[in-house]
Swiss-Prot record:
GO terms for molecular function: ATP binding; proton-transporting ATP synthase activity, rotational mechanism; proton-transporting ATPase activity, rotational mechanism. The gene is atpE. Has multiple subunits with at least A(3), B(3), C, D, E, F, H, I and proteolipid K(x). Its main location: membrane. HAMAP family: ATP_synth_E_arch. Belongs to the V-ATPase E subunit family. Pfam families: vATP-synt_E. This is A-type ATP synthase subunit E. One of its GO terms (cellular component) is plasma membrane. GO terms for biological process: proton motive force-driven plasma membrane ATP synthesis. Keywords: ATP synthesis, Cell membrane, Hydrogen ion transport, Ion transport, Membrane, Transport.
Amino acid sequence: MRGVAEEKTLLEVIIQELRRAAEEESRRIVKEAEQEAQKIVEEAIQKAEAIKAEKLNQLLNEYRQKAMAELAPKRLELRHRAIREKHELIESALNRAIEEAVKTILGNDDYRRTFLEKSLEKGVVALSSTDLVVHPCRGSASIVGQVVEAVAARLSKVKPGLRLEIGDPLGCTEGVVIVSRDGREIYNATLEAKIAEVRESVKPKVLELVSRARA
């Protein structure tokens, strides 16, 4: 009987040991499964976040490109408007300055005579012909005779044989138009021509100064 009892006890021990080993293996498998599941979940979350971030970046890039595409014409329009307004302001300032200068010249007989003499002398020197007809503007008609004589005397050594004849008056404001006798040469020495010359010469310089000041 004792031997049977000992065998039973040994069997129980073996069963318990097997059960314990099975439980440990089961717990290990469950733990590994839980860890694997946790790992899968974490990887899934990371992938989802990566996809979400990538999608978000893609959307941001798309919106940014769309915004840039929509803003580009507006920026160009604003730039053109700014340039146009700058030119208009400069043009207005030039006009005011020129108007003041013209008023000063026309309001003073000495200035008118000086302008006429310098313009006539410059034109006579610029033309190759020595036989010239001087057509005065309406504002210079009353003094052109004296000025022509003075300029002819002053330039007689520079252009031997110089002959200046006063022609019919023109509708311009001040100054003269000089034409060679054969009609092949002409020189516009009017106040209007001088204004245009000054405007074309000064405007680029003013634009450059304004651009430098804003830079």
